[in-house]
Amino acid sequence: MMNLTNKVAYITGGSKGIGLGVAKTLLDNGMRVAITSRHLSAAKEAAASLSSDESKVLALQSDVSSMQSEVDAIKAVTEHFGQLDVLVANAGVGHFASIESLTEQDWKDTIDTNLTGVFNSVKASIDALKQSKGYIITIASLAGTNFFENGSAYNASKFGLVGFSQAIMLDLRKYGVKVTTIMPGSVATYFNGHVPNDADAWKIQPEDVGQMITDLLQMHPRTLPSKIEVRPTIPGK
């Protein structure tokens, strides 16, 4: 069982949605967090909403599609906090169109962020996580096992992410590093231009994902839930 007090989590895409909800929950449970966004102003605004104490919250600019950007961000985390215990690979985008309408740039942006971006985050953080015997949480989607119309790019990225995550789980467990893939259904976030509102009350809330991660971190070291599907209890109409 991980004692969460003063442990450090690095959360990509942490300025809103699931990432921000996870950061808030981990912070409430005594952890320190580093959150990233492609835009530093967004990361700083989110960090300020969490805490004014820079010893607890660090805001960083990083583009997960760039390996060097992630290497620089992880270096900043370890220099600031002195350690890294948890990676939450959450940054993601969605482009939805029929194959006739899907552009090459939409395809590239989706794969570079949702799949290559996680590869970059893992590669950049793995040495620090081996040292701490830490935990990697990848945020996939039910779209990682269920395909749908106009979802070719998104499905490909999330199917790939599930496979990647399960493979590295086998690679890394011998070092004491755990890997879990969380596959949420409908979550009340700003994803794909949506603005959360009262009609989203039936959906999973970002803090629910944060609570799930907290529970995972506190499980006995001998126990490894490698893949978790989570849905709203009662789907909305």
Which residue stretches match the model-derived regions?
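C-terminal helical subdomain
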Residues: 177, 181-182, 189, 198-237
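Substrate-binding pocket helix/loop in short-chain dehydrogenase/reductase
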Residues: 98-99, 106-108
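The beta1-alpha1 cofactor-binding region of Rossmann-like NAD(H)/NADP(H)-dependent oxidoreductases
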Residues: 40, 61-73, 104
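Residue(s) in the substrate-gating loop at a strand-loop-helix junction
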Residues: 141
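Conserved glycine-rich Rossmann-like NAD(P)H-binding loop of the short-chain dehydrogenase/reductase
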Residues: 29-45
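Active-site helix of classical SDR
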Residues: 122, 157
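Conserved glycine-rich cofactor-binding loop
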Residues: 8, 15-17
